[in-house]
Amino acid sequence: MACLGLRRYKAQLQLPSRTWPFVALLTLLFIPVFSEAIQVTQPSVVLASSHGVASFPCEYSPSHNTDEVRVTVLRQTNDQMTEVCATTFTEKNTVGFLDYPFCSGTFNESRVNLTIQGLRAVDTGLYLCKVELMYPPPYFVGMGNGTQIYVIDPEPCPDSDFLLWILVAVSLGLFFYSFLVSAVSLSKMLKKRSPLTTGVYVKMPPTEPECEKQFQPYFIPIN
């Protein structure tokens, strides 16, 4: 019995010695989550184009060699955060938002250039960029201070069909006006020529020249 108790005591002593490397490894993996973070910078103000397109860079530092990055764009409304678009990518040049067709971007080292399309005036607000370095460990996360995006709706353009009808109406009006002016001018010209000719050709006999007067010579007799 004494030997059995001694063996159990030795096993209990050896169990912590075998598990402590795993505990240390997990500690090293999860300590950076709470102790280290990345700094994310983004412009403070961006004005969207007349087509509702806004682009802004999202840069994080310090730079870490990572194979998998997750970028999330959040919109802050009062005290609430709404996810606009998010993606996880591993390529070095393109950032694909498969579930968000109105978002696109490019990646270059530690800089992500984001583009949001289809914005309207009601979408004006503060947009925050969140960056997560997923793989390889350790895990890093950071969020920017936000970019205020201003969107101005363009003035509504007139209907193209309406403009086409206006152009056709003006063209027809000018055509009939020129036709009327030409008809009036031709009528006046014909009225001026009517007293001079009846418009019927009549063959006239040739006129004979007036005969010269013949004088009888007057002789004066001389005795």
Swiss-Prot record:
Ig-like V-type domain segment(s): 36-145
Cellular component, GO, one term: protein complex involved in cell adhesion
SUPFAM superfamilies the UniProt entry points to: Immunoglobulin
PTM sites of type Phosphotyrosine: Y201
Glycosylation sites: N108, N113, N145
Tissue expression remark: Widely expressed with highest levels in lymphoid tissues.
Keyword Signal carried by entry: yes
Intrachain S-S bonds: C58-C129, C85-C103
Keyword terms, alphabetized: Adaptive immunity, Cell membrane, Disulfide bond, Glycoprotein, Immunity, Immunoglobulin domain, Membrane, Phosphoprotein, Signal, Transmembrane, Transmembrane helix
One Gene Ontology biological process: adaptive immune response
Coiled coil feature spans: none
Signal peptide: 1-35
Assembly and binders: Homodimer; disulfide-linked. Binds to CD80/B7-1 and CD86/B7.2. Interacts with ICOSLG.
UniProt name for this protein: Cytotoxic T-lymphocyte protein 4
Source organism phylogeny: Eukaryota, Metazoa, Chordata, Craniata, Vertebrata
Gene responsible for this protein: Ctla4
